[in-house]
């Protein structure tokens, strides 16, 4: 698997393209690219510009689906504690949240329109990790776009991890979509919610074939998780993570890596990537890459799905629904329901 230096650069650093290419395409082959790159923190317009430059490169390699990391638009606030301790929130932490809230995007909104235009312009299915702003609550969200430039929908992370829970809301069962497309059924789960067996089972029941796993986890153990999901679900797993150095975040005292700042230099790696593409048989098709910002691509033979399902179909012939079953509450969970709205809905259904 060659690592090929490309002429263009991003942030004045060389961008690498790691590509595992079949010698020929078939009608059941899809070229997939996962993007391993850092957000331009607190600068959403510049991050969108960077996303477009990366899409140009991916499209030039023939990518049909491109997956970006968790929270690429809006940023993953690695190392920050937002001034929180039990029973106390600091003024500096509240200001940090204000800035983070300002960098998030509305869905729908102008940034979503721009992402739609990018997907259509470069003729790719686009899976983009964003921080979604819904009033004054933020969600870690994945947006889906088709190659015609249409916004398909979103998935909100159902379970933020650890301190993420103080800044992100919890998604509900209404945003666990799997989209039927000409290149396969596409869905996504974000970072550690991929460790939730029931969420994965819901995805499998919806028939996911191209399972996107944007993440912020660059540990070796993450590779075991992605391989297990591919084998369990009989699906391709496309996992994209950011590669970031300390200098990719604002300097102190504006932004502080709690507990580790004194040990970091501007070039210290704070997120090592590890983006990877796994086949339904558990084979590594491309990656993992821990070297720097990269476009990691592979050709997906969709026939591998049927060959894998012959052995193991977790919601089909290898299930025991009369013994073990799952109920998914897939309706929105709104904190307030106005009776006038409910009455109108009831009247319309009579």
Swiss-Prot record:
Entry's Gene Ontology BP terms: cyanide catabolic process; detoxification of nitrogen compound
Alphabetical keyword list: Hydrolase, Lyase
Disulfide bonds: none
InterPro entries reported for this sequence: C-N_Hydrolase, C-N_Hydrolase_sf, Nitrilase/CN_hydratase_CS, Nitrilases_CHs
Catalytic activity: L-asparagine = 3-cyano-L-alanine + H2O; 3-cyano-L-alanine + 2 H2O = L-aspartate + NH4(+)
GO MF term list: 3-cyanoalanine hydratase activity; cyanoalanine nitrilase activity; nitrile hydratase activity
Protein name per the record: Bifunctional nitrilase/nitrile hydratase NIT4B
Source organism of the structure: Lupinus angustifolius (Narrow-leaved blue lupine)
Upper classification of the organism: Eukaryota, Viridiplantae, Streptophyta, Embryophyta, Tracheophyta
Gene: NIT4B
